[in-house]
Amino acid sequence: MSTMTDVGVPETSRPSNAKPWYKVLYIQVLIAIVLGVLVGWLSPHLATNPWIKALGDGFVKLIKMVIAPIIFCTVVSGIAHIQDARKVGRVGIKALVYFEVVSSFALILGLVVGNLLPVGHGLAAKPDAGAVAKYVDQASHMHAVDFFLNIIPESVVGAFAKGDILQVLLFAILFGFALMALGERGHRLRDVIDDTAHAVFGVIAIVMKAAPVGAFGAMAFTIGKYGPAALGNLIGLVALFYATAALFVFVVLGVIAKFVGFNIFKFLGYIKDELLIVLGTSSSESALPQLMEKLERLGCSKSVVGLVVPTGYSFNLDGTNIYMTLATLFIAQALGIELSFSEQVTILLVAMLTSKGASGVTGAGFVTLAGTLAAVNPALVPGMAIVFSIDKFMSEVRALTNITGNGVATVFVSWWEGELDHDRLHANLDKTIDPSDVETAVTTG
């Protein structure tokens, strides 16, 4: 059974029963990708058939369909519930400051690595001229003043109808603060928005069932049109993302852990069961209740855990941040689009906003990428099909990095607030966790 968290995303109380291997989404997508590679390699003519291409494009459109409502619901709910931070004094502000600083590190790290190791160069992917023409024409007439004025929608309905991410974000931010100001009078409306978010994520769950079909179509078309050499670029992106995420966890989060007074490797060992749950579901949210319980046992105060962890699932997704900047640069390189320094700075600024609309559910990172591309340079949007085929392989690492980042964030804010029990922290990290404790963590919620 699922409930809603404070940030308006569904909370899974425990992992589902084991499925037969052929029903596991990861296996289905893997098989679909292998079949797509074979079809694209052995029969390029068939692979480039419009109907095959439509499988991948159709799935991307299904994802784009829910971008606006997802961003609206999660941002509004996240801001509206921040009023709870008043009950715990400075914790809310400290958490948000931490989120912004560390998220910026993650975004910048992805951007730096993507520039130093441009694995997308040489792919020479070219989307259909018709698909790109309207974006290019639109961009050529867009000046800086027009860009900022365009953020303001002429109507709220129009913003959602066009799927303009920045316009939806602006309205969501204003609406969230207005709802927060209502206090208890806005309680019922917050519940409605939370329930709406739950339903929208249910739509994503349905859409994700078509992921194997979309992966097959996207991979078959990519290999059929660009040749087997495209695999090298795609594998390069996966490897680069894995290495960058590991660098972030062991260096950036490791330094933060060292500053507080604990070892990042021992912390990873402490939450190993939650990490395994996340690895199997590709969703950092699947282990949320267990993580909260373990952090309390680790010595973090209940009030800090109750605020920082749920809020972090909308405002502190480090793995998603790294993915967004890396994937955006990869797509630009693959399409032969040179991004200037100012455009790359824009990526950072836009990603800081769009990442706040990401949640810890499977596929949310890809949804957020779509929003970032649409806001930065719509001409990049058709390139989403290039990375979709391998998105599943990056989803697990995104989720693992996200949950680790939120765990470290909670310990840090507890320490900053002076509410971290160092004796319990070291007692738990320096010992082997009793099996009964693990069982308690898994069944809590």
From Swiss-Prot:
Principal location class: membrane
Record's bilayer topology term: Multi-pass membrane protein
Keywords, ordered alphabetically: Cell inner membrane, Cell membrane, Membrane, Symport, Transmembrane, Transmembrane helix, Transport
Transmembrane segments annotated in the record for this chain: 24-44, 62-82, 105-125, 163-183, 201-221, 237-257, 322-342, 370-390
Key word Ion transport present: no
Annotated Pfam families: SDF
GO biological process, one term: L-aspartate transmembrane transport
Location in or out of the cell: Cell inner membrane
UniProt xrefs under InterPro entries: C4_dicarb_transport (IPR023954), Na-dicarboxylate_symporter (IPR001991), Na-dicarboxylate_symporter_CS (IPR018107), Na:dicarbo_symporter_sf (IPR036458)
Keyword field contains Cell wall biogenesis/degradation: no
GO molecular function terms listed in the Swiss-Prot or TrEMBL record: fumarate transmembrane transporter activity; malate:proton symporter activity; succinate transmembrane transporter activity
GO cellular component entries: plasma membrane
Family per similarity comment: Belongs to the dicarboxylate/amino acid:cation symporter (DAACS) (TC 2.A.23) family.
Described function: Responsible for the transport of dicarboxylates such as succinate, fumarate, and malate from the periplasm across the membrane.
Protein name, as recorded: C4-dicarboxylate transport protein
